[in-house]
């Protein structure tokens, strides 16, 4: 599912989504190490147990974060794509693309982490105005139009939703 959201509202939308207690575990992807740390910090401030893994963390810190996530001491793992490579997580409820990947194949790798071993899993993506081009490239690669969630409290006001009438240029 795709959530169109203004960049400044992504943080609030993520907290809103994670308030659903039926989500036992979530893997949140960012494009950068700095972004992963930032997301982890604001989730922790919102009393959502989160840890970040990325290339600037020691191997020991990454392994501890992963262990805490697998045993559900940590509910949310925030990761960059490189750090998440090779990670095997069973029973992952939700993958959240907090930032749309700029490489379409990366999207496929990210969403492939949910619903393994015949279990239910879901992937959602937050798309702001600057990420629309990445979304187009992803949809072209997978040949699927990703369903849009058009009712949420932080719906973007400046991103045209597919099928909406286009504004005429003066």
Give the positions of each predicted feature:
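Conserved helicase RecA-like core
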Residues: 1-160
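Intrinsically disordered, Lys/Arg-rich low-complexity segments
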Residues: 162-170
């Amino acid at each position: 599912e795709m959530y169109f959201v203004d960049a400044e509202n992504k943080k609030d939308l993520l907290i809103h989504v994670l308030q659903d207690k039926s989500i036992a575990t979530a893997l949140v992807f960012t494009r950068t190490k700095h972004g992963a740390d930032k997301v982890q910090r604001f989730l922790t401030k919102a009393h959502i147990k989160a840890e970040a893994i990325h290339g600037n963390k020691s191997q020991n810190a990454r392994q501890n974060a992963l262990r805490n996530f697998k045993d559900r001491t940590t509910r949310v793992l925030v990761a960059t794509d490189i750090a998440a490579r090779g990670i095997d997580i069973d029973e992952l409820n939700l993958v959240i693309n907090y930032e749309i990947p700029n490489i379409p194949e990366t999207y496929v790798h990210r969403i492939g982490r949910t619903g393994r071993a015949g279990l239910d899993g879901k992937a959602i993506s937050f798309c702001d105005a600057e990420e629309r081009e990445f979304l187009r490239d992803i949809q072209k690669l997978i040949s699927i139009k990703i369903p849009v969630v058009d009712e949420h409290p932080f719906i973007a006001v400046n991103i045209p939703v597919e099928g909406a009438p286009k504004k005429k240029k003066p």
